[in-house]
């Protein structure tokens, strides 16, 4: 069965680019999202997120009649579910969005349909999703019931793209295809090959789920090593960025760069899925998460020390000291604030500090709710002119272009080594 109509459930940072990629190949694409604002924005040919090159692709797809958005699922040949999978307070995965998405498409499923889960998920999630679908559609057969002869094919195919480069990497990167059966994998591969230039690498759904978690846990462990080095170097009076530069001259050493912590919807979340299912075995992965989650507290302590130094060297009162935090996103040059350590740091500073806390984030127009009323969103030049203490949290290009003399004779906490 060919794929004439494709539906993408969840039109966020992954779902919308995926929908746009299919639509750019002149496939009929129906995007589904519960956010009415996002739906209306897309149907105007505009985008509600920041991602280079995405806006033009969406505009052309909508104008060409290949992409439309709605809040209610409709019948399609293939469904791709790209909804959030956060963790709960106890770090157990929260599959509520996936369950809701699956149950929303169940009434419109037809024989021959393909359902792909893209959301980062714990091992076994694809089989669980298939169970939800089967429970709502006893008139259809699914892979866990009928194997290769199932009416509906199901696969797990995780994304592996870098925010800020999504429209390139979505097409160029290899794709892991984890079907519940070989037929499921073959059909999922055929779907992605509509736009994919990379290779479709086939496995089973459980291995594909674990592969995504493994990739991000590997990165988290390596970042934790760099972050722990930064704590040690601060204690020993050593420039950690110089140290890493020198150590990386060893032909078999490649240490990553430290920062204020780890954020985003993948690296800061996915390792907990492994830990939750394997608490006795995943000791290193848990420790890495704890190291990275602890880094923001250390940064706040450095800011408190900088304010104390400022007070000791001037005649200002604490309420007269202005602190400027540079960056809120979880990585450079994007507007995505999910799980951002910079957000938590800015919030902690503003709650502790009796003076004004300025925030500079060039990729947003208004502060998120958790900072509204605590901080002041400021322009770059205004913050540089007004602040006594400068806190570098995200190395956006605009910040890296700041000349050294602009921060001269200020109290600086630089978590990214931009002003070293």
From Swiss-Prot:
Enzyme Commission number(s) of this protein: 1.1.1.336
Pathway stated in the Swiss-Prot or TrEMBL entry: Bacterial outer membrane biogenesis; enterobacterial common antigen biosynthesis
Keyword Phosphoprotein carried by entry: no
Residues the record lists as binding UDP-N-acetyl-alpha-D-mannosaminouronate: 160-161, 212, 216, 219, 250, 252, 263, 330-331, 416
PANTHER family: UDP-N-ACETYL-D-MANNOSAMINE DEHYDROGENASE
Protein name in the entry: UDP-N-acetyl-D-mannosamine dehydrogenase
Gene that encodes it: wecC
EC category name: oxidoreductase
Annotated organism of origin: Salmonella typhi
Family recorded in the similarity comment: Belongs to the UDP-glucose/GDP-mannose dehydrogenase family. WecC subfamily.
């Amino acid at each position: 069965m060919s794929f004439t109509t494709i539906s993408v459930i969840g039109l966020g940072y992954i779902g919308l680019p995926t929908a746009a990629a299919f639509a750019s190949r002149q496939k009929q694409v129906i995007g589904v999202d519960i956010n009415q604002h996002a739906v209306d924005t897309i149907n105007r040919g505009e985008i509600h997120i920041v991602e280079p090159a995405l806006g033009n692709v969406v505009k052309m797809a909508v104008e060409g009649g290949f992409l439309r958005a709605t809040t209610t699922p409709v019948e399609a040949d293939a469904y791709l579910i790209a909804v959030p999978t956060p963790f709960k307070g106890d770090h157990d995965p929260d599959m509520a969005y996936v369950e809701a998405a699956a149950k929303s498409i169940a009434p419109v499923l037809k024989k021959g349909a393909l359902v792909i889960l893209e959301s980062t998920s714990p091992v076994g999630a694809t089989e669980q999703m298939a169970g939800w679908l089967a429970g709502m559609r006893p008139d259809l057969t699914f892979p866990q019931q009928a194997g290769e002869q199932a009416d509906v094919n199901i696969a797990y195919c995780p994304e592996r793209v870098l925010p800020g480069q999504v429209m390139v990497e979505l097409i160029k990167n290899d794709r892991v295809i984890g079907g519940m059966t070989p037929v499921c994998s073959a059909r999922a591969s055929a779907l992605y090959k509509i736009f994919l230039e990379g290779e479709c690498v086939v496995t089973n759904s459980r291995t594909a789920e674990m592969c995504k978690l493994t990739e991000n846990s590997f990165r988290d462990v390596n970042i934790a090593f760099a972050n722990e080095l930064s704590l040690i170097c601060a204690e020993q009076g050593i420039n950690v960025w110089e140290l890493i530069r020198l150590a990386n001259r060893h032909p078999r050493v490649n240490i990553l760069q430290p920062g204020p912590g780890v954020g985003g919807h993948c690296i800061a979340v996915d390792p907990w899925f492994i830990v939750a299912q394997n608490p006795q075995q995943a000791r290193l992965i848990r420790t890495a998460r704890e190291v990275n989650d602890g880094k923001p507290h250390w940064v706040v302590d450095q800011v408190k020390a900088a304010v104390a130094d400022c007070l000791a060297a001037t005649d200002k009162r604490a309420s007269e000291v202005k602190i400027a935090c540079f960056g809120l996103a979880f990585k450079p040059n994007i507007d995505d604030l999910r799980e951002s350590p910079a957000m938590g740091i800015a919030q902690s500073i503003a709650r502790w500090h009796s003076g004004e806390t300025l925030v500079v984030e060039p990729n947003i127009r208004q502060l998120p709710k958790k900072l509204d009323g605590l901080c002041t969103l400021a322009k770059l030049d205004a913050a540089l002119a007004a602040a006594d203490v400068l806190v570098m949290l995200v190395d956006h290009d605009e910040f890296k272009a700041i000349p050294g003399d602009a921060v001269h004779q200020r109290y600086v906490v630089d978590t990214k080594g931009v002003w070293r």
